[in-house]
From Swiss-Prot:
Protein name: QWRF motif-containing protein 3
Gene: QWRF3
Native organism taxonomy: Eukaryota, Viridiplantae, Streptophyta, Embryophyta, Tracheophyta
Annotated transmembrane regions: none
Annotated stretches, region: Disordered: 1-60, 171-220
Short motif (QWRF motif): ranges: 292-295
Family affiliation: Belongs to the QWRF family.
Compositionally biased intervals (Basic and acidic residues): 1-20
Composition bias type Polar residues, residue spans: 191-219
Biased composition (Low complexity): 21-42
Length: 482
């Protein structure tokens, strides 16, 4: 690789000398067709790559806060526009993309002076290679490592620092036609000479990127490591041609700022270092991954919520079905109990059917026996028994019965007459019965008292006898003493 680069440098330097020799000649119309062809090719490539840039999410003309441009996605490829207007004045020291002159130091890329049209071709090739990367996942690591090594080699090539006063001196002299024509011819020749070497190198990078097209899905995933850096186009090591007059002065300024760039830690107070651009690019990648992970987490949360709601619905449906099954089981149990009771009742009825069938045969005999009992009771109550051949005179019996009926009628009439008086006598009789009961109780008490009185009389008599005996004894003793 190093030998190929040295050969390319040698060939390009030789061609740059030829351009410097042509720079001294009068302006010709041969440079303008080349320029037009390059712009037309670049416009076609730009149209073809619009879809690729939209797919890769590249941001065009994104500027930092200090006024410099930072490329996201593909360094040295963020802007592919070329000025196609012929009336605009080209400048070999200021790129068409960076058409803003910054105060103080101005960072100019070494490759920007030589390739304007060839960059568009290289960008189209790289975009195609990155589009092919989205088809596979296995070779992304190898591609990222090779491209990171290339980029590390390219990052060691800082741009040429030009002071603002030289740029003012150059832009302050637009009236000199010779300088304009020389600069245009020099720019066109340098672009045409440097296109071949860059295309060869881009073909090698394209082969590497096509080999790494099987890991694009893994590479584009949020979990990809930060080591995979963006692909950049290698800048050539060519130097701008050394012209006469103002060119020598500019070359002296280039050498001065180049030596100062090697000694100073910062290339420019306005334009950040390559590490700053890399850190900004990594920050964008990390932000992109963070957004992707947030989207993934939000989608996962949404999916979890949907799954939870579905599970809840399923649980509710299962709970409802279980309740229905419990109700069905209870209903079946109730039906089973009813059937068991019906079977028991049928068994009892079947056990009594034989007796009922036997009762149908016994019912006639039972009715006949009941009729006989009724007749016998009637004869006992309403008929006189005649035994041992007794005979009755019917006339006398009838007269006696009539007299008995008349007596019973008289008794009934007297009872009816005394019935209201008996209604008043009944409570008196009840009261009299109560008085009689109380009288019996009092009589019993009197009997007890009389018995006690008799006992007390006996005791009184015995006491009197004892008292008399004692009195007599005392009297006798007194007499004996006297």
């Amino acid at each position: 690789m190093k030998s190929c680069e040295h050969e390319l440098l040698k060939t390009r330097r030789g061609k740059s000398r030829e351009v410097s020799s042509r720079f001294l000649s009068s302006p010709s119309a041969s440079s303008s067709p080349n320029r037009r062809n390059s712009t037309s090719n670049s416009s076609r490539d730009d149209q073809n790559n619009n879809g690729v840039k939209g797919h890769l999410g590249l941001k065009k003309h994104d500027r930092m806060s200090d006024g410099t441009r930072v490329c996201f996605g593909l360094p040295n490829q963020s802007s592919i526009e070329v000025d196609t207007k012929e009336n605009r004045m080209p400048s070999p020291w200021i790129n068409d993309e960076d058409n803003v002159i910054l105060p103080g130091r101005f960072s100019v890329d070494e490759c920007a002076l030589y390739r304007a049209s060839s960059r568009r071709n290289s960008c189209s090739l790289l975009y195609e290679s990155f589009n092919d990367e989205t088809d596979s996942e296995l070779s992304d690591v190898s591609c990222a490592s090779s491209l990171s090594t290339n980029r590390s080699s390219w990052n060691h090539k800082p741009g040429i620092k030009v002071s603002s006063k030289y740029l003012h001196d150059l832009t302050a002299k637009p009236s000199k036609g010779n300088n304009k024509t020389k600069l245009r011819s020099q720019d066109d020749s340098q672009r045409t000479n440097s296109s071949k070497g860059i295309e060869n190198r881009l073909q090698r990078n394209n082969s590497v990127s096509r080999y790494g097209s099987s890991m694009s899905q893994w590479a584009l995933s949020p979990g990809r490591s930060l080591d995979t850096q963006a692909v950049t186009v290698p800048s050539s090591k060519l130097k701008p041609p050394r012209g006469k007059g103002v060119g020598k002065l500019i070359n002296l300024g280039f050498d001065f700022f180049r030596s100062k760039n090697k000694s100073s830690p910062f290339t420019s107070p306005l334009k950040p270092k390559t590490c700053d651009t890399e850190s900004a690019h990594q920050l964008k990648l990390m932000n992109n991954r963070l957004l992707q992970w947030r989207f993934v987490n939000a989608r996962a949360c949404d999916v979890n919520k949907n799954v939870a709601s579905q599970e809840k619905n399923q649980l509710l449906c299962a709970w409802d079905t279980l309740i229905k099954l419990n109700n069905l089981v209870l209903q079946e149990r109730i039906k089973l109990q009813k059937k068991n009771l019906e079977m028991k009742l049928n068994y009892v009825f079947l056990s009594q059917v034989k007796h009922l069938e036997a009762w149908e045969d016994m019912e006639i005999q039972h009715l006949s026996s009941l009729s006989i009992i009724r007749d016998s009771l009637h004869s006992v109550l309403s008929r006189l028994p005649l035994k041992e051949g007794a005979k009755v005179n019917l006339e006398s019996a009838v007269s006696i019965i009539k007299n008995a009926e008349a007596v019973t009628d008289a008794i009934i009439s007297t009872v009816d007459d005394y019935a209201p008086t008996m209604e008043g006598i009944v409570p008196l009789a009840s009261q009299l019965a109560e008085v009689v009961v109380q009288e019996k109780l009092m009589l019993e008490k009197c009997h007890d008292l009389l018995r006690m009185i008799s006992e007390l009389e006996m005791q009184e008599r015995s006491l009197k006898c004892c008292f008399l005996i004692q009195h007599k004894q005392t009297f006798d003793t007194n007499l004996l003493k006297h």
